[in-house]
């Protein structure tokens, strides 16, 4: 279902562009210095794509005592796997897209032929 649900946040604005049981697609505007809550998603991946600005993603790893910090600029993408606490903050005024999707079976492909190069 395509909606245009726009909501103000303490850090800026989020707008749900697409939401259905398989994927969610949100446009976010994050003001410089804006930071979301530390949170996790039990079953969904959370992807971030930056259109303009700079978004800093902190991921608090479950498998070891470490916090990964990644700074995304225009054209950069990263994802956070389900169950990992994370947050984002904007080092500059930022426009980005958040994509959410469930963990699906990664071995979903059934090949009938093998790829090749033709002369």
Q: For the regions a protein language model found, what residue spans apply to each?
A:
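Short acidic-glycine-tyrosine-enriched beta hairpin
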Residues: 61-83
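A short, N-terminal "cap"/entry segment at the start of jelly-roll beta-barrel domains
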Residues: 4-27, 35-38, 68-70, 112-119
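Glycine- and acidic-residue-biased ligand/ion/polar-headgroup-sensing regions
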Residues: 43-62
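Double-stranded beta-helix
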Residues: 7, 85-119
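Short, well-structured hydrophobic secondary-structure segments
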Residues: 28-43, 48
């Amino acid at each position: 279902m395509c909606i245009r649900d726009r909501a103000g946040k303490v850090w800026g604005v989020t707008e749900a562009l697409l939401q259905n049981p398989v994927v969610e697609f949100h446009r976010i505007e994050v003001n410089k210095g804006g930071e979301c809550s530390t949170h996790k998603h039990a079953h969904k991946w959370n992807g971030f794509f930056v259109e303009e600005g700079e978004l800093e993603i902190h991921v608090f790893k479950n498998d070891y005592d470490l916090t990964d910090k990644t700074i995304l600029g225009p054209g950069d993408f990263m994802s956070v796997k389900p169950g990992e606490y994370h947050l984002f903050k904007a080092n500059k005024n930022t426009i980005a897209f958040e994509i959410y999707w469930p963990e699906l079976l990664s071995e979903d492909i059934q090949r009938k032929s093998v790829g090749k190069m033709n002369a």
